[in-house]
C-alpha cells in the first residue's frame, strides 16, 4: 500500500513513503490510466524534487507519454503550461509548506482539471500499488524535452492588470527561498520594461531547498516577521509573502499588519464585480459573512465545500469569474479556474493605485464590520471528544440546536473541523461576528478552553 496518496494529492515522507521507485511507478500508472499523448512536468526547490521529477518522467516515457519539462516552477506554472499548450495533463513535484523530509505531487489532466480522490487519483494509486505494468515497448517510448514558458506565463499574468493604472509603489516580496524567486525577478523585469513605477524589495528571493530561513508558510504567525519587518523598515506600501510553490500569497498592509485571507477574498470579489456586475463569486463556508455581504451588493455569492477540487468544480458549473478561500487560495476563471498566488497581489496592487487608498484603508471597514478570529489550529490527543464538548455546550445553550450556534446573527462558530496534519490530528477553529470584537474574542476564548479541557 502506498501511503503517500492522500485525498487530493500525493504527499509523503522521503524514503519509505516516497522515493524514486515510487515516483517511477506513479508516472507509469498515470500514463497507463489516462493514456495521455503529452504532459508537462515541473518541480519546486526541494533538494529531492529534481530526482523525483526525472524518475516520474521515466515512468511516463515508459508508458509511451511525451514529457515536456518546464524546470523549477510553482504549481500554477504547471496549471498554466497545461492549458496554454493544450496538452493532456501535468504534474508538479512539490511538498509546498510541509516539513523538510517530505515531498509530494499535484496532478492535473487536460485543461488543468485536478486529479483527486474521486477523479482519477484512486485509479492511479491502484495501478501504482499493483506495479504490474506491461513490458516497455522501446519503439513507442515517449520523448523528453526541456522547455521554457516563463515569458508566456508572465504575459498571461500581466493580462489581469493595466500597467497604466499603476502609480508609484514600493512592494516587499518575500519568496521564502522557494520557487517564487525567479518569477518575481521576471515580473520585476517586465515592470521595468513597461516603465511601471513599481519598486520591488525582494526578501529571501534566492531559491534554496535547504530553506535557511525556515519552511515558507506565512499562514503561521511565526513565519511573518521577516515580511512585516521589511515593510516597516522600507516604508513599503504593501508586503507579499509566498509559500514554497507559491500557489498561495499572503498580504501585509503598509504598517506591516498581516491581512487575513478572508478579507482579501472580499476585496477581490468587489474588484471583479465592479467590472462584471451580476457575476457569480464562489466562497468556502468557514468564514463567509463579509464575502456574502460584499458580493450580494453587486453579484451572486455561491458557497462551495472547502478544498481546491470542490471549488474548481463548482466554479466551472456556475461559470463563476472568481473564487476565494480564507486559506489564501484564489481561483480565476481566466486561469482555467485554477488557484494562483501571483495574480491576486498584482490585482490588489492595481486596486491600491486605482482607489488612491492604502491596503489597510481598503480592508479596515470590512474588518470592523465582520471581525474574525482567523483560523486557529489546536493539536489535540482526542479531537473528536473535544469537538463533542463544544457541541454539547452550545446545544444546551441553544436548546438542542447545532454547534453552529447563535442564529441571532451576532456571532457564529463559522467552522470547527478535525483535519489530519503530518503527525497528529488538528482541530481548526473559526469564529466571526457582526461588528462585535469583544463578543468574537469572548466566544473564541471559551471554545478554546472547551477544546483543551
Curated annotation (Swiss-Prot):
Catalytic activity: alpha-D-mannose 1-phosphate = D-mannose 6-phosphate
Pathway(s) served: Nucleotide-sugar biosynthesis; GDP-alpha-D-mannose biosynthesis; alpha-D-mannose 1-phosphate from D-fructose 6-phosphate: step 2/2; Bacterial outer membrane biogenesis; LPS O-antigen biosynthesis
Names of the cofactor(s): Mg(2+)
Keyword Magnesium in annotation: yes
Superkingdom of this protein's organism: Bacteria
Record Gene3D superfamilies: Alpha-D-Glucose-1,6-Bisphosphate, subunit A, domain 3, Alpha-D-phosphohexomutase, C-terminal domain
GO biological process, one term: GDP-mannose biosynthetic process
Active site residues per record: 96 (phosphoserine intermediate)
Annotated cofactor note: Binds 1 Mg(2+) ion per subunit.
One Gene Ontology molecular-function label: phosphomannomutase activity
Enzyme class, first EC level, given as a word: isomerase
InterPro entries according to UniProt: A-D-PHexomutase_a/b/a-I, A-D-PHexomutase_a/b/a-I/II/III, A-D-PHexomutase_a/b/a-II, A-D-PHexomutase_a/b/a-III, A-D-PHexomutase_C_sf, A-D-PHexomutase_CS, Alpha-D-phosphohexomutase_SF
Keyword Magnesium: yes
Keywords, comma-separated and alphabetical: Isomerase, Lipopolysaccharide biosynthesis, Magnesium, Metal-binding, Phosphoprotein
Binding of Mg(2+), residues: 96, 243, 245, 247
E.C. number: 5.4.2.8
UniProt similarity note: Belongs to the phosphohexose mutase family.
Function of the molecule: Involved in GDP-mannose biosynthesis which serves as the activated sugar nucleotide precursor for mannose residues in cell surface polysaccharides. This enzyme participates in synthesis of the LPS O7 antigen.
Protein name as annotated: Phosphomannomutase
Source organism per UniProt: Escherichia coli
Lineage: Bacteria, Pseudomonadati, Pseudomonadota, Gammaproteobacteria, Enterobacterales
Chain's gene name: manB
